[in-house]
């Protein structure tokens, strides 16, 4: 397994990490994702550790805390061998302190997560969303205190806009608070919006990308193709409305190129889609999920080999999107590109 520094931090993480969204299985969304219990979760953790995957990601909102509980049971007795990443901010109830990133909420949410996980520290705590109702200074001062207390070690964010992340980094620098080292983002061959602003920001500021849904919410599994009905067992029947938007015709074009490359090199469509991401700038780790051992072992096969330059160019071309303003002049006009050439 290859390991990379998480952004500009000294924390080294595997290029593949395990997303525990399938653990617990409560509610319409997470129930459709999977219902992995503690016994099965422990087997999946065993497989991950054997392969060198030691970072496990969850969130308090996943199955109303059950995902954290199951993960905690699955890693019991081997805490020193794993890195735990969890997230908070989204609503866990209807009370005034059940959502957001206020001082009261962050302290309580961290303590609750520690209890559910059965540990006394969290390696990486991420804000699941930007809370516009809480001053950034309050958020960062609280996180600074949690780091000083030993309850968390590194901090990151998820699903932030560029200005939200940049302002947070500036406030941290101004007041001497720890900086965010990771941004958990949606990024896939079927969704490359991350590249317009968040990727250059991450490269400039040393914020590593942790990629969620590398298979485009289950659309790049190799089971969805042009002219064929959605498989009866696909979770997209229940979860499509929760996921990122996808242009179906473009998706089919991407899958056709993935199919062709899969035939050429003897790899699967998901393995190729994940491997492509590992070659993109700023990507520290890609989160893979699995409802069973077979899915996990297949996804683990995405590392240990490389796509050719020609294959990467084909995937780049078929998945390319039209850049929105103000990004398109830098990709279409030499004068603009000379001043600020795109990263990809």
Predicted regions and their residues:
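Short, well-ordered coil/turn segments that N-cap beta-strands
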Residues: 11-16, 52-55, 78-82, 118-123, ...
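Terminal-tail/helix-coil boundary detector
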Residues: 1-2, 42, 204, 228-264, ...
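Glycine/proline-rich, positively charged
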Residues: 27, 33, 93-197
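Conserved, mostly hydrophobic/aromatic
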Residues: 6, 18, 41, 48, ...
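Glycine-rich beta-alpha junction loops
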Residues: 88-90, 161, 187-191, 213-221, ...
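N-terminal binding-site loop/beta-alpha segment at the start of enzyme catalytic domains
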Residues: 1-82
